[in-house]
C-alpha cells in the first residue's frame, strides 16, 4: 500500500490506548500527522497517522482534522546576498518530515533600506526561543551553544562579593555637608518659628533672583515665607503681625523644663523680695499686654510659677532645696509648717516624760510635719470604736456642763462673749479668702452639731436603749469631725504663722475632745443601763459642743 505524503494535521479529541500492534496510542490534545485519510486505503473509520516517528492506524472519530495553513508566499523584498544578517534560510522538507515536533516556520520580516538588517532565524543550536535584548547584538566572542539568552550585567565591575547585585545607578547624588549639633539645641522636636520679613530679604539664596536647586529633603514652605496663607501651623494673628518685636528665640510652644536649675547664690533671707522682683519684671520681658495671646489651655496654669506670699514674721530656717527652684513660691512645693505652740487659752504643755515630746526633742533636724510623732492607732481611735480607752488620762478634763439644754445654751453664750480676739491679725489676701470660705462652712457644721447634741441629750433623758441613742451619737461625731477637718486644712494652707498657730491649737483640742466623746458614747452603749456611763457621755458631749463653739467663734473673730 503506497503512502501518499500529506501535510494534513489532526488533533486528538480523546485519549486512546492501542489494542493492536498496528494502532497508535495517544492522549487528548496531541497533534498527529495524517498520512492517509479515512477510507483512502479501504480503511473505513480509520486514518493512517504518524506520532513521534511511529506510524499506525487511528480511530477517525477520536481525532479532528485541522485546517491546512496557507501556502507560503514569496518574499516581496528579496534579500541581498551581500548582507548575511538579512538572509532567511528556509528549512528543507526532508528536515520537516524527520522532526519530532511540528514547529511553524519563523517570520520573515522585510529589512528597511536604511536600517541594518537583523537575523530573523534563531541559532541552530538554541533549544528555546527567547526574545532578544533591546538593542543588543550577539557578539562573535559569545558562546554559540548557550542555552539561555541573558543580557550581560550593566557596568559590572569585578568584585569578590558572592551575591550578584545590580550595579548602582549613575545618577549623581547631591553631597550632604554634615552639620555638627549646636550647643543650644533643645532635645525636644519643636517646629521652627516663622522668620520675620527682614530676615527673608537678606537671605542670600533669594537675592540672585532665582530659586535654589531642589533640596534633598522636603521642608514646609512657611519656614521661609511669612505668609498667612502658607502657614502650616495655626497661630494668633497678633504673633504674625508683631513678629519683628518678638525675640528671635521666643516661640509659641510651651516646652517643659528638663531638670532642676542651678541654685541661686542669693541668701535665703531675700527670697521673698527676689520673688516679688521677678514677678515685677515679668511684664517688661514679655510682649505688650494688648498683644499677648491667650494661654493654650488651663493645664498651663499649673506650670506657671506662683508668687510667694509676703510674710511679716521673722524668716524660718531654710528648708531642704526644692526639686524645682523656679517654683519655690508655689503653695504645693512649700514644706508643711511646724506644729503650732500650745496657747494658754487652749491647754497646757505636755509633761516632760511624754514619749512624743522626747521623740521630737531628739530629732536633730527639727519637726518637719505636724503629724510626725502621732501614732496611727491613737489618731484614728475615735473612728474604729474598739479597744481600751488609752488616752483618757493623758489630759485633764474641764468641769462638766449640766445636762439641762437651757443651761447648756446659756453656758455656750457666755463662752462666745468671752472668746474675742485681743489683737486683730494682719492677714494677706489669700489668708482672708481662706478664712471667709471656711468660716461659712463652720457655721453650717456647728448648726448640724447643735441639732445632733440636742437629740442625743433628749434621748438620754428619756432613758432610751443604745439602739436609739447611738445613731444620735454618730451624728454628733460626724458633725464634729467636719470641724476638725476644716481646722486641719486651714492650718496647712494659711501663710501667716500666727493664724496657723491659733487655728491649729483650737483644732487639736477639738480633735482630742471628739476622741473622748466617741469612747464615752461607746462606753455608755456597752454599760447600759449604767447611770455613771450615761453621765460621762453627757459630760463629754457638752465639752465637745463647747470646743466646737470655741473653734467657730475663733474663725469668726479673725475676720475683719
UniProtKB/Swiss-Prot annotation:
Keywords: Cell adhesion, Phosphoprotein, SH3 domain, SH3-binding. InterPro entries: CAS_C, CAS_fam, EFS_SH3, SH3-like_dom_sf, SH3_domain. Residues 259-268 have a biased composition (Pro residues). Pfam families: CAS_C, SH3_9. One of its GO terms (molecular function) is SH3 domain binding. The modification Phosphotyrosine is found at residue 253. It comes from the Eukaryota. One of its GO terms (biological process) is cell adhesion. Residues 437-487 are annotated as: Divergent helix-loop-helix motif. A motif (SH3-binding) lies at residues 304-310, 334-340. The keyword Phosphoprotein applies. Residues 198-210, 351-361 have a biased composition (Basic and acidic residues). Residues 5-68 form the SH3 domain. Residues 305-315 have a biased composition (Low complexity). PANTHER family: CAS SCAFFOLDING PROTEIN, EMBRYONAL FYN-ASSOCIATED SUBSTRATE. Docking protein which plays a central coordinating role for tyrosine-kinase-based signaling related to cell adhesion. May serve as an activator of SRC and a downstream effector. Interacts with the SH3 domain of FYN and with CRK, SRC, and YES. Contains a central domain (substrate domain) containing multiple potential SH2-binding sites and a C-terminal domain containing a divergent helix-loop-helix (HLH) motif. The SH2-binding sites putatively bind CRK, NCK and ABL SH2 domains. The SH3-binding sites that bind to the SRC SH3 domain are required for interaction with CRK and are implicated in promotion of serum response element (SRE) activation. The SH3 domain interacts with PTK2/FAK1. This is Embryonal Fyn-associated substrate. It comes from Mus musculus (Mouse).
